[in-house]
Amino acid sequence: MEINTQITAQPEYDIQFWNAMRSKKTREDVLDKGRDVSTGTYSMPNAAARKVMAAIEKEYDFRKIATVIRAYKNGYKIFAKDCKDKAEFVAEGAAIPVYESAGDFNENTIESHKLASIVKLDEDFVSDAGFNIEKYLTEKLGKSFGRAEDEAFINGTGKEEPTGILNDENGADTALTAETLNYDAVIDLYFSVDKEYRKNGIWLMNDKTALTLRKLKDADGNYLWNPASDTILGKQVILSEFMPDIESGAKPIAFGDFSYYWIVERKPVSVRTLLEKYVLYDQIGYLAFELLDGKLVRKEAIKVIKIAETKE
């Protein structure tokens, strides 16, 4: 069933949804318009769904630097144009050349990977009219969804989950393989990225790698990392716990334009109550789903350093 976001934006739907979350009497004729028959869940009201996304972005950075697209209809495919746009000077009165670009599109099939989360809450809180259940659920779901999303957008295999930027086959291009992470290797990575993508380039690494880079100096003793702005070569650094350490065979640093990583939302966040599962604990469970996919649509837009594998 395709969810009509105009319905989930209505105040009456919002009231009935939160009545359902509190196990109160609801108007099924209103609530059923937001029901996903495949999961038995109800789409969150638009305002609450936005709060979930805000909670994700508060804790995790990948959605901030990627391109987020809504594609709620079934059967969607996206097309990424991999060619550079072409312009030519044309003499007065001369024919304008027709540029055939149909073959320059790479077709990227977008799946609907299901991300699930369960949040539990004591019945006393649920029945307390003064307890802000919307704030609690949106923040909890934002944190759990955000953590799973970020890990998948970086390390995902593409099978039953998004394709991460570190995926060997469909992720970012490997710019170089280095025995160790030194000043020259970082400079080589920077200039391996085409100027088109370098202009909006961002560094991605974990805390341990950042600590190593903070200590790197050039031949004149100048630090690679600018502590005043927390930048490397003038470009922002983002830290993620899901980037690997500097170790054999790993890809500890990614650099490039992350807007070419597309996060495609296939269905809005939806929730249903689990009344019986936790009854012995005087709790109510909330099962939530998010359907989405993620892919790097231009492999050359982001490059990585790979640490050479040690021979045993």
Segments from the language model and where they lie:
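Short, solvent-exposed loop/turn segments at the edges of secondary structure
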Residues: 73, 112-114, 281
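Short helix/loop capping segments that flank catalytic or ligand/cofactor-binding pockets
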Residues: 80, 86-90, 98, 128-130, ...
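Extended oligomerization regions of viral-like shell subunits
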Residues: 157-293, 301-312
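Alpha-helical scaffold segments that mediate packing/assembly in large oligomeric complexes
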Residues: 98-191, 304-312
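Alpha-helix initiation and N-capping motif
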Residues: 14, 49, 59, 75, ...
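Short loop/turn segments at secondary-structure transitions that flank enzyme active sites
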Residues: 82-87, 116, 125, 147, ...
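A residue-level signal for conserved active-site and pocket-lining positions in enzyme catalytic cores
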Residues: 78, 141, 286
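Assembly-associated, polar helix/coil segments characteristic of icosahedral protein shells
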Residues: 1-108
